[in-house]
């Protein structure tokens, strides 16, 4: 293939000059001849010069170094050999367990499935987490976002979902760690290993310390592996149901922002890249379910300064089937998971999908909590005594519901000392229905805090008296 030479280096962005009749195409991978570094072409500037992003550190590079064009986009290993392995953005193993034993590779840039290949999701995916199953149920083959500011529990929620779904679900999972803490990636690996499901998980990491090129493309690497599992036919001619976990989708946007100005683009609102919606759409449209197989995706979304109107989380909202919003106010009450029951939504919360009983109980819970929210100002100024008897009852039930929405997690056992609880959906509905009906008005609200099913609250009440 053609060879060129480096003519300019600005951080992660590198300009390479090629002969005019042998210019690489956009998204072609280039390799340095004398160093182990891959570049990805982003723009053709003319006069034989292309602008590229480095998929690694550009330290030690200098002008005039030789670069070879591979003539194809970055491709990564796919298939069963990737399971149980930790790989980087280029699909190279980083777990010191030898090379990935496969010749099957797939380019990280793929077209999204065509409209007529898509399948509509209607089945509910039970998570065992009460607040999620009741108020923002997940769809099999759907897309879910966990929104939250710094330190409200996105990663812990993500880990619990992996614990409850990936272990119960006999299918395959892909975990893409995008710009997050290396420690969390290590914890995740050991968590999977200890629970004997490592052979069903492929892990791709581009952590916080990596250059922006790695963080920009690592989500696509993980997605490409998940797509292969989805499209790979078994003996019955069907694809697989795959789980794709992305932590954190905001860092994907942030990496794009870091290189956008270096690529010569004018920044848009709040300094984000002008191509924000298009970049997000290109990634999200590929995370979808076809008639052959499905990808159920759970994505953590960091919310800068707790502002949900920030362009990055706001752009992500449009692509999701369910949004789980984690609230700092609820976390400050000591209620975990700190899911905001009035802000979190799901397209599946429809009587035609979840059934009348589930829908009625969920809306009853939300209306009780909403009424409590409205009464809080009155209580703060005038006190409880000024409320009508009916409103006092609403407040008492709302406080019980609020506490019953908390739940001990398996992944937090080592910190809290209380064993994790998995609550089946029918138990969740039964519990909240009973609280709304007033069957537990005689129990103290503390009995409902950090328990699993409603029977545990009744047992706990006996120990409180």
Curated annotation (Swiss-Prot):
Gene3D superfamilies: 2.40.10.170, Bovine Mitochondrial F1-atpase, Atp Synthase Beta Chain, Chain D, domain 3 (1.10.1140.10), P-loop containing nucleotide triphosphate hydrolases (3.40.50.300)
Enzyme Commission (EC) number: 7.1.2.2
CDD domains linked to this entry: ATP-synt_F1_beta_C (cd18110), ATP-synt_F1_beta_N (cd18115), F1-ATPase_beta_CD (cd01133)
Molecular function per GO: ATP binding; ATP hydrolysis activity; proton-transporting ATP synthase activity, rotational mechanism
Disulfide bonds: none
Keywords: ATP synthesis, ATP-binding, Cell inner membrane, Cell membrane, CF(1), Hydrogen ion transport, Ion transport, Membrane, Nucleotide-binding, Translocase, Transport
Organism domain of life: Bacteria
InterPro entries: AAA+_ATPase, ATP-synt_VA_C, ATP_synth_F1_bsu, ATPase_a/bsu_AS, ATPase_alpha/beta_chains, ATPase_F1/V1/A1_a/bsu_N, ATPase_F1/V1/A1_a/bsu_N_sf, ATPase_F1/V1/A1_a/bsu_nucl-bd
HAMAP family in alphabetical order: ATP_synth_beta_bact (MF_01347)
Subunit structure: F-type ATPases have 2 components, CF(1) - the catalytic core - and CF(0) - the membrane proton channel. CF(1) has five subunits: alpha(3), beta(3), gamma(1), delta(1), epsilon(1). CF(0) has three main subunits: a(1), b(2) and c(9-12). The alpha and beta chains form an alternating ring which encloses part of the gamma chain. CF(1) is attached to CF(0) by a central stalk formed by the gamma and epsilon chains, while a peripheral stalk is formed by the delta and b chains.
Entry's family note: Belongs to the ATPase alpha/beta chains family.
Designated name of the protein: ATP synthase subunit beta
């Amino acid at each position: 293939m053609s060879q060129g030479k480096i003519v300019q280096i600005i951080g992660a962005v590198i300009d390479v000059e090629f002969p005019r009749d042998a210019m690489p195409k956009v998204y072609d991978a280039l390799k340095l001849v004398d160093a182990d570094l891959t570049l990805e072409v982003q723009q053709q500037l003319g006069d034989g010069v292309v602008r590229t992003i480095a998929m690694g550190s550009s330290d030690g590079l200098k002008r005039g170094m030789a670069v070879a064009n591979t003539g194809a986009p970055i491709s990564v290993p796919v298939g069963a050999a990737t399971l149980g392995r930790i790989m980087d953005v280029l699909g190279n193993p980083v777990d010191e367990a030898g090379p990935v034993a496969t010749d099957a590779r797939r380019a990280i840039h793929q077209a999204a499935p065509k409209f007529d290949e898509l399948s509509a999701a209607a089945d509910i995916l039970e998570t065992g987490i009460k607040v999620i199953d009741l108020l923002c149920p997940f769809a099999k083959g759907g897309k879910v976002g966990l929104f939250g500011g710094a330190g409200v529990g996105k990663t812990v929620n993500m880990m619990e979902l992996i614990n409850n779904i990936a272990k119960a679900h006999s299918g395959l999972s892909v975990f893409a760690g995008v710009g997050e803490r290396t420690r969390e990636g290590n914890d995740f690996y050991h968590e999977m290993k200890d629970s004997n499901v490592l052979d069903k998980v492929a892990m791709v990491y581009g952590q916080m310390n990596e250059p922006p090129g790695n963080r920009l493309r690592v989500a696509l690497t993980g997605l490409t592996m998940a797509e292969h599992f989805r499209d790979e036919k078994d003996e019955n001619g069907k694809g697989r149901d795959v789980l794709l976990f992305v932590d954190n989708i905001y860092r994907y946007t942030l990496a794009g922002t870091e290189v956008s100005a270096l690529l010569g683009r004018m920044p848009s609102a709040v300094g984000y890249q002008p191509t924000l919606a298009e970049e997000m759409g290109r990634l999200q449209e590929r995370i979808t379910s076809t008639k052959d197989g499905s990808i159920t995706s759970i994505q953590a979304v960091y919310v800068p300064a707790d502002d949900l109107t920030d362009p990055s989380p706001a752009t992500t909202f449009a692509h999701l089937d369910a949004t789980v919003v984690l609230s700092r106010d609820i976390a400050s009450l000591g209620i975990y998971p700190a899911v905001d029951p009035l802000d979190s939504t799901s397209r599946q919360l429809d009587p035609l999908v979840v059934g009348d009983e589930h829908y009625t109980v969920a809306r009853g819970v939300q209306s009780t909590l909403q009424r409590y929210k409205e009464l809080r100002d009155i209580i703060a100024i005038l006190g409880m005594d000024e409320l009508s008897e009916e409103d006092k009852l609403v407040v008492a039930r709302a406080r019980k519901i609020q506490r019953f929405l908390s739940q001990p997690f398996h992944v937090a056992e080592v910190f809290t000392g209380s064993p994790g609880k998995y609550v089946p959906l029918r138990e969740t509905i039964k519990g909240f229905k009973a609280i709304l009906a007033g069957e537990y008005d005689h129990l103290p609200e503390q009995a409902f805090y950090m328990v699993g099913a409603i029977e545990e609250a009744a047992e706990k009440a006996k120990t409180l008296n």
